[in-house]
């Protein structure tokens, strides 16, 4: 069930689902696995926000176990294509493609809440059928592994051989460790207290 927010204005009350209300504040929330449906929603929201104001940052909050590499790369490419900076924030878990998207935010604007977990690893896949079909799938997985590792190396500043070694198996990090690694830029402890006028 999606929560509804009710706002009052001079013309009466208006109800929004919570995600539509957040979108008005330029906040996109990835709170599920990366699938064709979730990726299409996120890409559409980013394109909408760019059209609405190409100068204002977009905020992508991530709590995701990962998911489809192809769909995640669609989000990644859109993040690189649009004009607004994309600030990424991990809330809970950014694993696999979730961690890749977290790292894909604008450098200097990638962060995590203090008790979140971040995990990188190599792409997963499976194949069945004739030997030639299995080889095609294996070659594709190796290609994707190379692309993802190269992007992680470019975005973290880590040498490619270290990325290859660290992504060979599940590699979990705390937010502080992710800052040291170069996946994110800061850990959010608490919101600054607003001065009361």
Swiss-Prot record:
Q: Where in the sequence is the active site?
A: 96 (nucleophile), 121
The enzyme's first-digit EC class, named in words, is hydrolase
InterPro entries noted in UniProt: ClpP, ClpP/crotonase-like_dom_sf, ClpP/TepA, ClpP_Ser_AS
User: Principal localization?
Assistant: cytoplasm
Catalysed transformations (reactions): Hydrolysis of proteins to small peptides in the presence of ATP and magnesium. alpha-casein is the usual test substrate. In the absence of ATP, only oligopeptides shorter than five residues are hydrolyzed (such as succinyl-Leu-Tyr-|-NHMec, and Leu-Tyr-Leu-|-Tyr-Trp, in which cleavage of the -Tyr-|-Leu- and -Tyr-|-Trp bonds also occurs)
Q: How does it assemble?
A: Fourteen ClpP subunits assemble into 2 heptameric rings which stack back to back to give a disk-like structure with a central cavity, resembling the structure of eukaryotic proteasomes.
**Per its database record, what is this protein's job?**
Cleaves peptides in various proteins in a process that requires ATP hydrolysis. Has a chymotrypsin-like activity. Plays a major role in the degradation of misfolded proteins.
Q: Which UniProt keywords apply?
A: Cytoplasm, Hydrolase, Protease, Serine protease
The protein's name is ATP-dependent Clp protease proteolytic subunit 1
Database matches in Gene3D superfamilies: 2-enoyl-CoA Hydratase, Chain A, domain 1
The alphabetized list of GO BP terms reads: protein quality control for misfolded or incompletely synthesized proteins
Q: Which organism is it from?
A: Synechococcus sp. (strain CC9902)
Q: Where in the cell is it found?
A: Cytoplasm
EC number, UniProt record: 3.4.21.92
Query: Which family does the similarity line name?
Result: Belongs to the peptidase S14 family.
Q: Do you know which NCBIfam families this protein is assigned to?
A: clpP, PRK00277.1, PRK12551.1, PRK12553.1
The cellular component terms of Gene Ontology attached to this UniProt record, alphabetical and capped at eight, are: cytoplasm; endopeptidase Clp complex
What Gene Ontology molecular-function terms does this entry list?
ATP-dependent peptidase activity; ATPase binding; serine-type endopeptidase activity
